[in-house]
């Protein structure tokens, strides 16, 4: 396992009768295809050549009409993001290069946690707190927050320069402060092509996890996304995190499945739950 945090690298392949975009994520030992078009047979053959033993997981966001073909080629469905492709669903389909990556000893425990999330009555929100949009000037303080909350994180959020880079690349941050330090933050990574955004980088210092802090931040991000004409949101939450899954469930995100040993986060490899929401309905 590679212990050095390395930024993922995106590469676009343009061939005669197809194109696809692949992210090489060496820290998490995976490749991920977020967009493809053209000859499916050629695309899958090409993916097979780049899915080397350096990686243990391959993920493709598959359009609904292509699911059966991917199944016939040995891929499995791990989850679904509602309305990912301009209102059409995306199916996350996977291949593996290692048995350990495919198997999860905590699956039943995480099923039980999800059932408890559904049973839990939402606690009342506190009065809307002071929140603001993050700027590049906050990068150092945000990096300190992520270092405080996560021993391991799947992207280089401990690096202020990386935070500045994602801000420049259409990621919006909202944050809360107390005693001149950031105590909670969340971001929305915008995909303007497909009119969606990933709600991510959610972190709250342990002493500030009361009163619906993260719910307030995500609701603020949702309103900001609507201003940006982004109509669909999704999030990928740690399957072991009762609090984060409860936040998404209580904000009317729909559960869409679980990604096995998807990333290194918090302290180890973890399964991740998929959640998605059509923001248009929440604004009606």
Regions found by a protein language model. Name each.
Residues 12-30, 143-206:
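A conserved beta-strand-loop-helix scaffold within acyl/acetyltransferase catalytic domains
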Residues 38-49, 204, 210-227, 246, ...:
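Conserved acetyl-CoA-binding loop-helix of GNAT-fold acetyltransferases
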Residues 51-62, 225-237:
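Conserved GNAT acetyl-CoA-binding A-motif
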Residues 59-67, 235-245, 249, 262-266:
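Conserved beta-strand-loop-alpha-helix junction that forms the acyl-donor binding cleft
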Residues 61, 76-91, 254-271:
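Conserved catalytic-core motifs of GNAT/GCN5-like acyltransferases
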Residues 69-70, 75, 247-252:
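Conserved active-site tyrosine of GNAT-family acetyltransferases
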Residues 128-142:
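A short beta-loop-alpha structural element at the N-terminal edge
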């Amino acid at each position: 396992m590679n212990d050095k945090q390395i930024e993922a690298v995106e590469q676009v392949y343009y061939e005669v009768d197809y194109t696809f975009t692949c992210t090489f994520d060496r820290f998490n030992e995976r490749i991920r295809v977020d967009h493809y078009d053209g000859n499916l047979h050629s695309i899958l053959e090409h993916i097979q050549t780049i899915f080397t033993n350096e990686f243990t997981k391959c993920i493709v966001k598959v359009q609904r009409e292509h699911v059966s073909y991917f199944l016939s080629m040995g891929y499995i469905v791990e989850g679904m993001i509602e309305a990912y492709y301009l209102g059409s669903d995306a199916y996350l389909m996977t291949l593996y290069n290692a048995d350990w990556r495919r198997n999860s000893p905590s699956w039943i425990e995480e099923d039980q946690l999800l059932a408890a999330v559904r049973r839990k009555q939402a606690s009342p929100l506190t009065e809307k707190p002071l929140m603001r949009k993050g700027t590049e000037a906050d990068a150092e303080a945000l990096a300190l927050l992520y270092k405080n909350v996560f021993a391991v994180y799947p992207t280089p959020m401990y690096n202020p320069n990386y935070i500045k880079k994602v801000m420049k690349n259409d990621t919006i941050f909202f944050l809360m402060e107390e005693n001149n330090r950031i105590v909670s933050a969340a971001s929305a990574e915008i995909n303007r092509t497909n009119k969606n955004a990933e709600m991510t980088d959610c972190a709250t210092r342990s002493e500030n996890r009361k009163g619906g802090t993260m719910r307030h931040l995500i609701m603020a991000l949702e309103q900001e996304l609507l201003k940006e004409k982004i109509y669909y949101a999704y999030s990928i939450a740690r399957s072991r995190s009762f609090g984060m899954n409860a936040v998404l469930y209580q904000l009317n995100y729909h559960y869409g499945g679980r990604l096995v040993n998807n990333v290194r986060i918090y302290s180890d490899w973890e399964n991740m739950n998929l959640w998605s929401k059509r923001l248009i309905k929440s604004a009606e």
